[in-house]
UniProtKB/Swiss-Prot annotation:
It is found in: Cell membrane. This is NADH-quinone oxidoreductase subunit K. One of its GO terms (molecular function) is NADH:ubiquinone reductase (non-electrogenic) activity. It is a multi-pass membrane protein. Signal peptide: none annotated. Belongs to the complex I subunit 4L family. Keywords: Cell membrane, Membrane, NAD, Quinone, Translocase, Transmembrane, Transmembrane helix, Transport, Ubiquinone. The chain crosses the membrane at residues 4-24, 29-49, 60-80. The keyword Cell membrane applies. Pfam families: Oxidored_q2. NDH-1 is composed of 14 different subunits. Subunits NuoA, H, J, K, L, M, N constitute the membrane sector of the complex. GO terms for cellular component: NADH dehydrogenase complex; plasma membrane. It comes from Chloroflexus aurantiacus (strain ATCC 29366 / DSM 635 / J-10-fl). It catalyses: a quinone + NADH + 5 H(+)(in) = a quinol + NAD(+) + 4 H(+)(out).
Length: 100
C-alpha cells in the first residue's frame, strides 16, 4: 500500500504548479486550468487524509466538492467564451476592466 505521505507530497506539488500557473500566466484559460488544478490537489489531499483517519465522510465531502467544481467549470467557461467574443482576447491584462 502506498503511504499517505506520498499522496500529500503529490498534492503539494500539484498545488504549487497551480499557484505558479495563476501567478505567472496571463492567458485566462490557463489561469482557469491552474485554479482547477489547485482544487483537485486539495481534493487529493483530503482523500489521502480520509483514507487514513476520517473515513467515508470526507470522501462524501470530496464528491460534493467535485460536483461544485463541475458547476464552476461550466460557469467559468461560459464567462471566458463571452469575454473572448466581446474583447477578442483571452489575456487577463486586457480584460481586467469590466466596462461594457
Amino acid at each position: 500500500m502506498v503511504p499517505t505521505s506520498y499522496y500529500v507530497l503529490l498534492s503539494a506539488i500539484l498545488f504549487t504548479i497551480g499557484v505558479l500557473g495563476v501567478l505567472l500566466r496571463r492567458n485566462a484559460i490557463v489561469v482557469f486550468m491552474a485554479v482547477e488544478l489547485m482544487l483537485n490537489a486539495a481534493n487529493l489531499a483530503l482523500v489521502a487524509f480520509a483514507r487514513e483517519r476520517l473515513g467515508v465522510e470526507a470522501q462524501v465531502i470530496v464528491f460534493f466538492v467535485i460536483t461544485v467544481a463541475a458547476a464552476e467549470v461550466a460557469v467559468g467557461l461560459a464567462l471566458l467564451v463571452s469575454i473572448f467574443r466581446t474583447k477578442r482576447t483571452a489575456d487577463v491584462d486586457e480584460v481586467s476592466t469590466l466596462k461594457g
